Amino acid sequence: MSNERRDFLKLGAAGLAVGAAAASVLDVRKAAAQAAPTSLLRTVLDRGHVIVGSGSTNAPWHFEDAAGKLVGMDITMAHILAKGLFDDDTKVEFVQQDPAARIPNITTGKVDITIQFMTVTPQRAQLVAFTRPYYVEGIALLTLPGSQMKTFDQLQAGGANTKVSILQNVDADNSVHMVLPQAQVMQIDTQANVIQALDSKRVDAAAVDLSTVRWMVKQTPDRYADSGKKWFSMLYSAALKQGDQDWLNFVNTAFDVAMYGHQNELYDKAFADYFGLNPPAREPGFPSI
């Protein structure tokens, strides 16, 4: 190796060390001073914790574990945000809220941000500001591992004899017929009953959220199977009050670093714990975002 090359590498290492040292001495109050005077970013940093609206009854997104601790993918995203704000992922205050309160609690200032499996739509974006998505939801088919209709190919081959349960709504039939045009559709009143119809073998598959399929297969692989089909993509994002670009930029940065950068331990562990999968490997070079 040439002397010039060695000197360059030494300078590079020194630069990294200086950068790390500079980052470590930038305290929270100095960071807060950089935000616009009216930005929630300054308020949150001065307060010392972030107030997050979420739920507690919908696994794998937000629910209580056996010890009564609030966990789930949404909850992990809140801890990721706290880690970015304070270098301490525990500095979160959760406000448990009904889904109908997600937008009102943002606009009234009851919460700093809502992280509660919220689907991005243009209509909602007129009321709140959405962060970058942290998950792409979809529809998938939950099946039984011992069934002759376990895979999507088998369900397709069943034609008009294939029976699928789905939560009752105006688009239910069309949602199933997008991928199984001949299937018999059984619309049912609750998600629990949609799955119970599969358990009792009244249907061959249950059309539910992709995250639900992944969670149930991860938890009980001897009881449930994933047919291998997913469709109808929907974005899940956090939501915050409109008009606060500093706060929105910061949340997006914290999420980007956790999902695409070097601080991905929390996100990756949650993705594996709740969905049974590992995110795609991050590779240096061309940015994947």
Predicted regions and their residues:
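N-terminal secretory signal peptides and thylakoid transit peptides that target proteins
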Residues: 1-16, 28
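Extended ligand-binding regions for polar small-molecule ligands
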Residues: 35, 80, 84, 161-162, ...
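Short helix-initiation/N-cap motifs at beta->coil->alpha
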Residues: 37, 92-104, 186-196, 234
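Short glycine-rich His-centered loop
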Residues: 49-73
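Periplasmic-binding protein-like
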Residues: 56, 136-146, 210-255, 275-289
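Acidic, polar ligand-binding/catalytic clefts
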Residues: 79, 83, 91-155, 224
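A ligand-binding cleft/hinge motif common to bilobed small-molecule-binding domains
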Residues: 101, 117-127, 175-178, 199-233
